[in-house]
Amino acid sequence: MKNKNKGKKSYFIFFLLIVILLGTTLTLWIIQPENFREIKDKVRILFSNHYADTSYNAKSLVLVDLSNDEDFISKNVNEKQLPASLAKLFVIEYGATLAELEDIVPARYEAISLTKEGSSVADIKETNYYLHNLFAAMLVPSGNDAAYVVADYLGGILSPESKTSKERIEIFMKKLNDYLQKQGYKDTVLYDPSGYDEEASTTVIDLKKVVKKLLEYQWFRDIVSQNFYTATLPDGSAVTWKNTNTFLDTTSEYYNKNVVGIKTGSLADDYNLVVLYKMHGKEFLICSLGSQSDSSRYDDVNYIIKTINESNYLKE
């Protein structure tokens, strides 16, 4: 009789261990950001028109209704992240206050040669460009070479006595950081005009601010909304760049006709994306920082777009 009881007890313990193991495995699977995300979101929306969301792959993100500046989805909005190529947005916003778009800018070999190996380029040549050409080269193909040429030129405006490209770029970056602090970008610090720098930092809140400023310029909207952008140089020649934003690519599975810009950025294992989306007669800004892969940043933003499309609250 005792042996039978022992046997039953052993089976019960074994069964209990199996249940615990399966339960633990299922729990770990459910808490992954991508699993049951739709159900999680619907539960949140039942209780609030705005929610802090942990079910996205990105380290930080924010969805903003630009018609009323209301944040609808947010995650770690004040947490500092690597801006990567999104640093170029701050460079352009400041640069637009220092010079005219039609300024003719010489692309010096010294500045171009500062481009780090393996980084994104616009194949800038040693010739003259309009400033707006170079802004487009920074925004569309995310050209780091163009960023150094722009910083070199603007540094020369700020410090005409500087003799080398490196000196001019250093002056520009110092003045840029001063400007950022004065303008209220309190969590943004940049050390390289291209964003190829693992010491830099920003937040989705600061990105929201700079993008809102840039969207006031029609030329900025025109540049970032195109999958292919053709620039006409001062000598009459033309160069065409392809946008790194896959949402604009008609051949991509992520293509969305209602996405009208803005920009991508990636460095090391962090993948960033800022998107301007039109729906319900309004514009929505999505800033996403620190996804683990190229596809996950698009999947996150794609899901937010789906939320916008289906939300009765955001239609108002």
Please provide the spans of the model-predicted regions:
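Membrane-interface motif at the C-terminal end of an N-terminal transmembrane signal
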Residues: 24-38
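Active-site-adjacent loops and short helices of periplasmic peptidoglycan-processing enzymes
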Residues: 34-205, 214-215
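N-terminal Lys/Arg-rich, disordered targeting/topogenic segments
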Residues: 1-11
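Penicillin-recognizing serine hydrolase domain
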Residues: 42-60, 152-316
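Hydrophobic membrane-insertion alpha-helices, especially the h-region
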Residues: 14-27
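Ser/Thr/Pro/Gly-rich low-complexity disordered regions
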Residues: 11-12, 34
